[in-house]
Design a protein with these regions (language model features):
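Active-site entrance/lid segments in N-terminal catalytic domains of soluble metabolic enzymes
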Residues: 1-210, 216, 246
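Alpha/beta catalytic cores of nucleotide-metabolism and tRNA/nucleoside-modifying enzymes
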Residues: 2, 55, 69-83, 145, ...
Length: 330
């Protein structure tokens, strides 16, 4: 088991997590997950490409993303990037999609990874592929010696399925909401508060079923401000995987822009390159100080203040706080 100072995980998105920002997050008491299908494993030096993505007009960005990500993944770069993070003395975490897990996981494990993330729009216990051998998640996790975090799950049944397959953590949501066009392109979106509550209920039932095995519930998406981050934990999440908030950091490789894996799909892009701007350093976004009351910095300070305001001293008890649904009055 790995313990971190704060309930935050850096999302495996090229605009958020590079080897250097993963190292910086580790030194700040959390973990950044590197996208092992991203630009850092396709190009020896992706910085010129990152700069061009940030400079393009929104209407031109998607076509360029498709072009940039058409470059093949290079296993030797997977090894090099993970070694770079490990040499810095922080926790090493990498992510693959279900479609490519079978193809590259041995490279990842041989390179040395502490946490392995399988992240997709929707993940089941057996991923079916026409191009590769199907991924039997239960057998895959059983054969590994590292904790596996899997998602996304959006309801009780899907989450329970992943827990029974052996996942150490379940990602709730489809991630990348600030950059997502899922609602417009395929008509799918997730009410995150309900989804987190449902998955937390699945976790409680699974604990009874398994004799006490605790699975981490990790909210993934719809947390662009600290208030949403706090609400996710109150609904039952143990941690949050943050994308857009960390993409606003001065150190972020997206240079004030943000995009997810859906934006680079070769035939049906379901995401956008969004302008998120820059609000401060990683230190300021996570720990403050804040200089604006807009929820973009000092996420941990906001969590501590909310817990104190509600009379709770730790996240476990905060997860049981009463929650009332009201109309949005903002």
């Amino acid at each position: 088991a790995y313990e971190f100072d704060i309930p935050v995980i850096g999302a495996p998105m090229d605009s958020v997590t590079s080897p250097q920002t993963a190292i910086a997050m580790g030194k700040l008491g959390t973990v950044g997950v590197l996208d092992l299908e991203g630009l850092w494993t396709r190009y020896e030096n992706p910085e010129p490409i990152l700069e061009k993505i940030a400079s393009l007009d929104p209407d031109d960005a998607t076509a360029y993303l498709q072009q940039a990500y058409a470059e093949p993944i290079k296993p030797e770069l997977i090894v090099e990037r993970l070694h770079e993070i490990r040499d810095a003395g922080v926790t090493v975490a990498g992510a693959l999609s279900p479609q490519r897990t079978q193809q590259y996981y041995s490279t990842v494990l041989n390179a040395g990874v502490d946490l392995f993330v399988i992240r997709g729009t929707s993940v089941s216990a057996e991923h079916v592929s026409k191009d590769h051998e199907p991924l039997n998640l239960k057998q895959f996790i059983y054969d590994l010696d590292v904790p596996v975090i899997v998602g996304g799950a959006a309801n009780y049944r899907a989450a329970l399925h992943l827990m029974r397959a052996g996942a150490a953590g379940v990602l709730v949501g489809f991630g990348g909401v600030a950059t997502s066009a899922n609602r417009q392109t395929i008509g799918v979106s997730i009410p995150m508060a309900t989804a987190i509550s449902d998955v937390a209920e699945a976790r409680r039932d699974y604990m009874d079923e398994s004799g006490g095995r605790y699975v981490q519930v990790i909210a993934d998406g719809s947390m662009g401000e600290s208030g949403s981050f706090v609400t996710a934990l109150a609904m039952g999440a143990d941690a949050a995987m943050l994308g857009a908030p960390l993409a606003r950091a001065q150190e972020a490789p997206g240079h004030g822009t943000h995009w997810g894996s859906e934006a680079r799909h070769a035939t049906l892009p379901r995401g956008l390159r969004s302008e998120v701007g820059t609000v401060g350093t990683l230190q300021e976004i996570l720990y403050g100080p804040s200089h604006k009351a807009d929820g973009t910095t000092n996420f941990i300070g906001a969590l501590r203040r909310a817990m104190a305001s509600c009379g709770y001293v730790d996240i476990k008890s905060f997860q049981r706080c009463p929650v009332v649904v009201t109309a949005n009055r903002s």
